């Protein structure tokens, strides 16, 4: 396990796609092996409420429309990205994210929030 605290991702951008999915991307972090996107329900402003997670080993991620929290026109949703120097383990992305998040691994600080507003 790496003892160095990885850098938080920079230049995170996101878009609510026409099909209802969300696409995020960010600058790759040197030596990062995985990233955990954290996100909130609609209109939650406190980062501590970003209790939903995804998992990716690249510097982009798409949340399927079926997994996006219900949003009405004008609703906001926030995303944060966290870097890990380890790869998650598990049968699916949720298990991989929980393995890192709940395990004894040192993730980065979270990125600045990406705020998306449903039109």
What do the predicted segments below correspond to?
Residues 1-31, 73, 88-119:
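Pro/Thr/Ser/Gly-rich low-complexity, intrinsically disordered linker/stalk tracts
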Residues 27, 34-76, 86-94, 98:
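Recognizes extended acidic, P/S/T-rich segments that occur
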């Amino acid at each position: 396990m790496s003892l160095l605290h990885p850098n938080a991702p920079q230049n995170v951008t996101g878009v609510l796609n026409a099909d209802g999915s969300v696409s995020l991307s960010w600058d790759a972090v040197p030596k990062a092996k995985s990233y955990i996107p954290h996100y909130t329900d609609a209109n939650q402003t406190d980062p501590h409420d970003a209790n939903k997670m995804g998992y990716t080993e690249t510097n982009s991620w798409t949340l399927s429309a079926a997994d996006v929290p219900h949003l009405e026109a004008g609703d906001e949703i926030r995303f944060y990205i966290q870097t890990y120097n380890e790869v998650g383990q598990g049968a699916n992305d949720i298990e991989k994210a929980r393995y890192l998040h709940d395990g004894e691994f040192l993730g980065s600080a979270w990125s600045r929030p990406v705020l998306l507003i449903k039109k």
